[in-house]
Amino acid sequence: MSDSLRIIFAGTPDFAARHLDALLSSGHEVVGVFTQPDRPAGRGNKLTPSPVKVLAEQHNIPIFQPKSLRPAENQAMVQALDADVMVVVAYGLILPQPVLSMPRLGCINVHGSLLPLWRGAAPIQRALWAGDSETGVTIMQMDVGLDTGAMLHKISCPILPQDTSATLYDKLAELGPRGLLETLELLADGSAVAEAQNDALATYAEKLSKEEARLNWQLSAEQLERCIRAFNPWPVSYFTVDEQPVKVWKAEVITTAHSTLPGTILQADKQGIQVATAVGILNIQELQPAGKKVMSAQDLLNSRREWFVPGNTLD
């Protein structure tokens, strides 16, 4: 391989840890890891380290967990590591300009979309919900904007009709490390070419909210089915019936035309619970009532058939 690089890695969740793992298996030297402070998690609200911290500890890499990189003393932590490049993957903190300029080759970021599409916090989910036919990862040179830096490398993959955010996440978690290592090779031997983003083509992937997860029957069946896949595994689409929230994990589109009020139950049997939408019918196949496990429509009908009487409406 080309010359070994001294790398600072900054990341927090599992998606980031998979990239750190790839770096640790390469010929590069990870001289320090920045990750978010431990957070309360689980039933006992016990302080829990991030997946990136756990991996760094296993490899005895120096770990830094500042709450912010704005204070000069925290920026000095970065400077002292004398890195060639800083690799940032789902870190969760803003990098001020002084930090971006510290490593010899600057800071690069792995982003889960084909930039300039879906800049922002939830690119995987937004691409799926929008009905895009493909997505991918972009490795970019970071600047102070929100995912606006020049692009160094892209890898794309198709979005399949059955993909959920969970399955796309796994695909991109495989593509990202590969693209990262290829980009580092180009940076190390001086052959990387940076391509400016076309801001006119930019779209924004706002963070998901639980409020968005409520199924809006005024949308088409196609839109709702994509919403269900985009919000799997979090926050999970839902409707309410008898004032009870019911999560929806799987559904299919029936293109049959109808003139029924959206949200009306048309049919409920072992094939699913068919609900009228603005365009077409949504056939709900897997559901989860509050406090229960995920179950088939048939299993839920066995215990709660009164919830799904044809002619009734869902909220």
Swiss-Prot record:
Gene Ontology cellular component list: cytosol
Family stated for the protein in its record: Belongs to the Fmt family.
Class of this enzyme: transferase
Entry annotated with the keyword Transferase: yes
Superkingdom: Bacteria
Keywords: Protein biosynthesis, Transferase
GO molecular function, one term: methionyl-tRNA formyltransferase activity
SUPFAM superfamilies xrefs: FMT C-terminal domain-like (SSF50486), Formyltransferase (SSF53328)
Record-listed (6S)-5,6,7,8-tetrahydrofolate binding positions: 113-116
Name this protein carries in UniProt: Methionyl-tRNA formyltransferase
Catalytic activity: L-methionyl-tRNA(fMet) + (6R)-10-formyltetrahydrofolate = N-formyl-L-methionyl-tRNA(fMet) + (6S)-5,6,7,8-tetrahydrofolate + H(+)
EC number: 2.1.2.9
Pfam family, one: Formyl_trans_N
NCBIfam families hit by this protein: fmt
Keyword match Protein biosynthesis: yes
Protein task: Attaches a formyl group to the free amino group of methionyl-tRNA(fMet). The formyl group appears to play a dual role in the initiator identity of N-formylmethionyl-tRNA by promoting its recognition by IF2 and preventing the misappropriation of this tRNA by the elongation apparatus.
